[in-house]
């Protein structure tokens, strides 16, 4: 996995959904699409709607599924063009290198990758030569480059989405260890 200038001992950040809080409203999907398309409302049409996360609804539960920014990311490991890299404590797609081969979609264990087709302008010597279709891999990029951070987190009406980083993960681990220690201590008899 190519590392774009990150330290070796850092953990990738990721967003996780709490299915106990998710109501399946899809507000996160809408916020994602708007955040990645400059707030243009025409991207909310059925033909153009391509969120980088997906709300999955079951009979009794709903939750958002998105990229977990794996440390040893299967999508990056199989990319034949080196278009998926580790950068800014996350896994990012370099669209200029992506050839839309869908290998990453097959490799992702979470179903968090998709390939979308976009119309792009073809330029030659600074002049437009028209438009063509380009397929490109898409996944959660943690709204990288947006000062407000991930749009999905800030709009969730039930606060079901949370950013997990190294500190949060360590705090969760300590809490679980303490709970396990107390549970075991309560059941001991000598």
Question: What are these model-predicted stretches?
Answer:
Residues 6-8, 12, 40-45, 50-77, ...:
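Flanking helices and flexible, charged tails adjoining ferredoxin-like Fe-S electron-transfer domains
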Residues 17, 93-94:
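Hydrophobic face of beta-strands forming the core of extended beta-sheets/solenoids
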Residues 23-26, 102:
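Conserved active-site region of classical short-chain dehydrogenase/reductase
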Residues 27-43:
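Core segments of cupin and vicinal oxygen chelate
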Residues 15-20, 27:
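N-terminal "mature ectodomain cap" immediately after the signal peptide
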Residues 33-36, 80, 109:
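Protein kinase-like catalytic domain
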Residues 70-83, 87-92:
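Ordered, amphipathic secondary-structure segments that act as subunit-interaction surfaces
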């Amino acid at each position: 996995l190519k590392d774009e200038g990150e330290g070796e001992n850092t953990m990738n950040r990721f967003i996780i959904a709490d299915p106990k809080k998710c109501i399946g409203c899809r507000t996160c999907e809408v916020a994602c699409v708007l955040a990645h398309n400059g707030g243009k409302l025409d991207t909310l049409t059925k033909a153009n709607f391509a969120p980088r996360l997906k709300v999955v609804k079951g009979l009794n539960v709903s939750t958002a599924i998105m990229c977990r920014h794996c440390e040893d990311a299967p999508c990056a490991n199989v990319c034949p063009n080196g278009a998926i890299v580790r950068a800014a404590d996350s896994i990012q797609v370099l669209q200029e290198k992506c050839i839309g081969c869908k290998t990453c979609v097959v490799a992702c264990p979470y179903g968090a990758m998709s390939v979308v087709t976009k119309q792009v302008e073809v330029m030659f010597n600074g002049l437009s030569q028209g438009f063509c279709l380009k397929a490109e891999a898409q996944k959660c990029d943690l709204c990288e480059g947006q000062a407000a951070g991930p749009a999905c987190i800030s709009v969730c009406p039930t606060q079901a989405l949370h950013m997990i980083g190294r500190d949060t993960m360590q705090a969760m681990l300590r809490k679980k260890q303490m709970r396990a220690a107390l549970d075991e201590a309560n059941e001991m008899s000598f």
